Amino acid sequence: MQQLSKRRLSALFVTAFLPVTAFASECSSVRFAEVGWTDITVTTALASEVLEALGYEPRVDTVSVPIAYAGIRNNDFDVFLGNWMPSMASISDPYIERGEVERLVANLEGAKYTLAVPQYVYDAGVTSVNDLAEHADQFEQRIHGIEAGNDGNEL
């Protein structure tokens, strides 16, 4: 009687975990959307190393922010680690509100956009935003933003 119970228990144990192992075999790769920014490249590389050590096969594709979100919605990507909040709200919130993308946790809080100039421009007198108007001709009255489609260009 004791042996029969062990067999049944073993069968129950194996049966209970079959769906889990089937699911795990379907999830052997993790597809990252990455936007080519130094910080996100490093964050994605670190996450990829950890996942490789756990037996997963990470794949990283460099795309723009809008394509990253559309790719998650379309199941082309699993993860995007470059969501800057609140500055990316205009891109991410519609996907989140429709339940197409889930924001799990923040890996960077309080992110903001700001202007930067090369040292030679700073040395020429552009040390704050207020100096831009005075030197506007040197910049053809233009400020260049980040990649196309990024909401930071709207600021």
Curated annotation (Swiss-Prot):
One Pfam family, short name: OpuAC
Record flagged with keyword Metal-binding: no
Gene Ontology cellular component annotations, sorted alphabetically: ATP-binding cassette (ABC) transporter complex
Signal listed as a keyword: yes
Transmembrane spans: none
Disulfide-bond pairs as recorded: none
Protein name: Uncharacterized protein ORF1
Organism: Chromohalobacter salexigens (strain ATCC BAA-138 / DSM 3043 / CIP 106854 / NCIMB 13768 / 1H11)
